[in-house]
Amino acid sequence: MTSSTSASEPVEPLADPWARPAPKALWLGLALVVTVLGLAAAGVRGLAAHVENPRASQAVERITSGAPWLIVGNSVAQSVVDPDRLAERLQVSAVAQASVDGALGPHVAALLRHHPPASGATVVVLMPTHNLLAGRLPSETDRALLVELLRWPDAPLTTLALGGAVSPLDLWRRDRVRARAALLGWVTATPLRIGAALSGVQVRVDDTLSNLGAEAGPVAGPSGPLPGAPPGRAVVEAEERPPESSVLPLLVEAAERAEARLIVVVPFDRRRQDAPCRTTPEDEAGRWLVERGVAVVDMRGAPLAPDAFSREFHLHNTGRAQATDLLAEGLRAVGPGAYWSGACGR
């Protein structure tokens, strides 16, 4: 009797674990995985499209700032010129330092051609002559910087600097650098975003950032040197071109189109401290520029203290004030299509 009753009772089926609703955490995890895979599949292009080389973007910002005087060059210009002091000596409202560490002549040409200064501005190009006359860019870093500065196809410039039009490889390299910078910025900023939701964490984050800012010093303003690699970064030298087939014609054309005054400065040279006083340029590039109405200021042989140099063309910070004063003297004295020698002031 007992066995027949128990046999007639219904038996509950075993529960199927897959039939239960998935926890919310699982769905969120799957959504996160899909998002990450989507970003990876897109090559982080959407994120990277808004990120630029900081060296290029800040130089562009300064050259288009509307400042009446602009310094354009590379780390040599950054080490030589104190923009605020130069503005005082020239009695102008502002001097913007738009130099880019590691820049060569094609980069300067790209800045002036694709990001023209305000009409009536004075553009002072200061870099060693062999850098200014550089032709084909020698390294991937140099090519990437040029591609970053271009806004439209520029056959004369890219043929000189790249050997032709911008290639897919150059664009891929640029996007790779942008993507890496964007992803790194997103990763490093994530803890701050999380901390912003927690007041206690936010206070600690702010304190940390304040301490870091105090250690690093103030961020450079519109007149200060651009951040980047230390002055004198070693580069593979580009082949020097004759003036007529270098970027000089492109620079002159860009200045004329922007209605800007162009002055080319030959920087201080530790090896040429005994250079003689001259009334005409000693090199072919200087003569070519003067013949086309461009002022040339030659600081070789100017009475600069020998211990002011840190390298061949670079100066210690302690030498910038004297160098800036000497440069201001030349910039005030030189006229259009004229040549001024700093050695004549000894």
Short names for language-model regions:
Residues M1-K24:
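N-terminal Lys/Arg-rich, disordered targeting/topogenic segments
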Residues P23-R45:
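Hydrophobic membrane-insertion alpha-helices, especially the h-region
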Residues G46-G66:
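Alpha-helical transmembrane signal-anchor/signal-peptide segments
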Residues E61, P243, P249-N317:
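Extended hydrophobic/aromatic segments used for targeting, binding, or gating
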Residues G66-A67, V92-A94, S119-T122, R257-I263, ...:
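Loop/turn elements at helix/coil->beta-strand transitions in domains of secreted/extracellular proteins
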Residues V72, V76-G164:
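Membrane-embedded segments
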Residues T141-A258, G345-R346:
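Secreted/periplasmic serine-hydrolase-like ester/acetyl group-modifying domain
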Residues R311-R346:
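Histidine-centered active-site loop/cap adjacent to the catalytic His
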